[in-house]
Structure formats: C-alpha cells, structure tokens
Amino acid sequence: MARLKITQTKSYIGSKQNHRDTLRSLGLKRLNDSVVKEDRPEFRGMVQTVRHLVTVEEVD
C-alpha cells in the first residue's frame, strides 16, 4: 500500500482552531516536521483541510 510523507511547511499561527487540531492529529508539532502515514481516505481528508500549511509526497 502506498504511503504519504506529510511535511508542515507553514506556521499555524493565525490559523483557525480546527486547522491546528488537524495538524496535531496528523502528528505535526512544529515547522518542517514530517510524518509518514498510510494512504487512506481519512488522512487524505485531513491533508485536504490543511493543504495550505503542508506538502505531501508519495513514498513507496
């Protein structure tokens, strides 16, 4: 199964509370933090919510 590497590229300062909560749920705590998650609809939806704060790469 494919995996996603999610990297926080922008600060959440000034963002809405639900965006901060989504970043925390993804496991991103600070700028340039990266996590690798399974490519599942749940994670895709979370990434879509904070797409302006993160970058996503597919990893094998």
UniProtKB/Swiss-Prot annotation:
Pfam families, alphabetized: Ribosomal_L30
UniProt cross-references to InterPro entries, sorted A to Z: Ribo_uL30_ferredoxin-like_sf, Ribosomal_uL30_bac-type, Ribosomal_uL30_ferredoxin-like
Presence of keyword Ribonucleoprotein: yes
Keyword DNA-binding included in the entry's annotation: no
Family, similarity comment: Belongs to the universal ribosomal protein uL30 family.
Entries under NCBIfam families matching the protein: rpmD_bact (TIGR01308)
Identification of the protein by name: Large ribosomal subunit protein uL30
